[in-house]
UniProtKB/Swiss-Prot annotation:
Belongs to the RNase HII family. Manganese or magnesium. Binds 1 divalent metal ion per monomer in the absence of substrate. May bind a second metal ion after substrate binding. Gene3D superfamilies: Ribonuclease H-like superfamily/Ribonuclease H. Its EC number is 3.1.26.4. GO terms for biological process: DNA replication, removal of RNA primer; mismatch repair. It comes from Clostridium botulinum (strain Loch Maree / Type A3). This is Ribonuclease HII. Keywords: Cytoplasm, Endonuclease, Hydrolase, Manganese, Metal-binding, Nuclease. Pfam families: RNase_HII (PF01351). It is found in: Cytoplasm. It comes from the Bacteria.
């Protein structure tokens, strides 16, 4: 849209144009958008000025996200620019039902800014919709990724601590490339024959760990939704096997299912 004669353009058309910018914005358009904001802010119409202010706020949020994302990439790159670095994280340590799942992800940490994956953070801080969107992007852009699980029966037989470590180990060892370094969240992965550094609150600092947490959570949540089709009385589609009041009452009423962790139910049954 040509904004040279802005005063002759109807508000609704300008708003559509502004909404389109927000939807399709890319890093390379930053200077162009700044020029548009300047023109909107000079328009005599208050509603058009508000569009300019909203667009400026959008751009500021984008710049904040760019900085946050770059910090997460740089956190991993500090271990070595030419290293293949895998992030690994698990989900499902605490639920009463279902497997524990881990994902390992190797990203290209040296891509240009505009090719980086934005909005990645601890999977628990993202909406379900955003996690699903990022899951697709991470899988497409990753050099390699792998998902592993340990089922409820093994958790009962070997214990959750062993299962937690084992699932992280399997996720890393199943990668199609061998990383030079593995970054894990919170604690080291035992018996891993690759250099490993553990990061406290790693899913909020490391782009590789945060990416793995997203893939693991999306995979497990979708698996529990599938189980819910067969075992709908437990509400797995929305509690993912965690011990909500509704879930606990269902266990007391219907008994445990084939995917429940019996070792986790001693205070319920």
């Amino acid at each position: 849209m040509n904004l040279n004669n802005l005063e002759n353009i109807r508000y609704n058309e300008i708003k559509e144009f502004s909404d389109k910018i927000k939807k399709e914005f890319t890093f390379s358009q930053e200077k162009q958008v700044m020029d548009i904001i300047e023109k909107l802010n000079k328009d005599p119409r208050k509603n058009v000025i508000k569009l300019g202010q909203a667009l400026e706020k959008f751009l500021n949020k984008y710049e904040e996200e760019l900085k946050r994302t770059n910090n997460m990439y740089n956190f991993d790159r500090r271990y070595g620019n030419n290293y293949l670095i895998a992030g690994v994280d698990e989900v499902g340590r605490g639920p009463l039902a279902g497997p524990i799942v881990a994902a390992a992800v190797v990203l290209d940490l040296n891509v240009e800014e505009m090719q980086r994956i934005f909005n990645i953070k601890d999977s628990k801080k993202l909406s379900e919709k955003k996690r699903e969107e990022l899951d697709i992007i991470i899988r497409e852009k990753a050099i390699s990724y792998n998902i592993a699980l340990v089922d409820n029966k093994t958790i009962d037989e070997r214990g959750i601590s062993w299962s937690n470590n084992e699932v992280l180990k399997r996720a890393v060892e199943g990668l199609k490339v061998k990383p030079d370094l593995v970054l894990s969240d919170g604690y080291a992965v035992k018996n891993l024959n690759i250099r490993n550094e553990f990061i406290i609150k790693g899913d909020s600092k490391s782009i590789s760990i945060a990416s793995s947490s997203i893939i693991a959570k999306v995979y497990r949540d979708n698996m529990m939704k599938e189980y819910s089709k067969e075992l709908n009385m437990y509400g797995f589609n929305h509690n993912a096997g965690y011990g909500t009041e509704e879930h606990v009452q269902a266990i007391k009423k219907y008994g445990p299912s084939k995917i429940h962790r019996m070792s986790f139910l001693t205070n319920i049954l």
